[in-house]
From Swiss-Prot:
<keyword id="KW-0889">Transcription antitermination</keyword>
<dbReference type="GO" id="GO:0005829">
    <property type="term" value="C:cytosol"/>
</dbReference>
<dbReference type="InterPro" id="IPR011605">
    <property type="entry name" value="NusB_fam"/>
</dbReference>
<comment type="similarity">
    <text>Belongs to the NusB family.</text>
</comment>
<dbReference type="GO" id="GO:0003723">
    <property type="term" value="F:RNA binding"/>
</dbReference>
<keyword id="KW-0694">RNA-binding</keyword>
<dbReference type="InterPro" id="IPR035926">
    <property type="entry name" value="NusB-like_sf"/>
</dbReference>
<dbReference type="GO" id="GO:0031564">
    <property type="term" value="P:transcription antitermination"/>
</dbReference>
<protein>
    <recommendedName>
        <fullName>Transcription antitermination protein NusB</fullName>
    </recommendedName>
</protein>
<keyword id="KW-0804">Transcription</keyword>
<comment type="function">
    <text>Involved in transcription antitermination. Required for transcription of ribosomal RNA (rRNA) genes. Binds specifically to the boxA antiterminator sequence of the ribosomal RNA (rrn) operons.</text>
</comment>
<dbReference type="GO" id="GO:0006353">
    <property type="term" value="P:DNA-templated transcription termination"/>
</dbReference>
<dbReference type="Pfam" id="PF01029">
    <property type="entry name" value="NusB"/>
</dbReference>
<keyword id="KW-0805">Transcription regulation</keyword>
<dbReference type="InterPro" id="IPR006027">
    <property type="entry name" value="NusB_RsmB_TIM44"/>
</dbReference>
Length: 129
């Protein structure tokens, strides 16, 4: 299955892990999506989810200067997760930043409010510079 689908599953896993009362481990959260999705790139999903969780403070520090009158805590949970995922992938993979940004915009269109993709694109454009 495509990286695009794997990013969707990574997003959903991170969203699940962000729930207030979640005591799931990363491996437990990923195991829920393994059933019925044998074609996903679970190595990539684990890399992305673990990387975001392990580097969350650094990612937030990287993102924060570009939020313009916002704080990371005030962002919608969906936007915060998408920004963290894309920033981690831009900084720690060989995937072209343009591809990562386009995927982040598509995730935002799918999971966030109507025009938030513009905000996500703007923040990521500044990060990739």
């Amino acid at each position: 299955m495509s990286r695009k689908e794997s990013r969707v599953q990574a997003f959903q896993t991170l969203f699940q892990l962000e729930m207030k009362d979640s005591d799931l481990t990363i491996n437990e959260a990923i195991s829920f999506i393994k059933d019925g999705n044998p074609d996903l790139d679970f190595e990539f999903i684990h890399w992305l989810v673990s990387g975001v969780k392990d580097h969350e403070p650094v990612l937030d520090e990287t993102i924060s200067p570009y939020l313009k009158d916002w704080t990371i805590a005030r962002l919608l949970k969906t936007d915060r997760i998408i920004l963290r995922m894309a920033t981690y992938e831009i900084l720690h993979s060989d995937t072209p930043a343009k591809v990562v940004m386009n995927e982040a915009v598509e995730l935002t269109k799918q999971f966030s409010d109507d025009d938030h993709y513009k905000f996500i694109n703007g923040v990521l454009s500044n990060i990739k510079k």
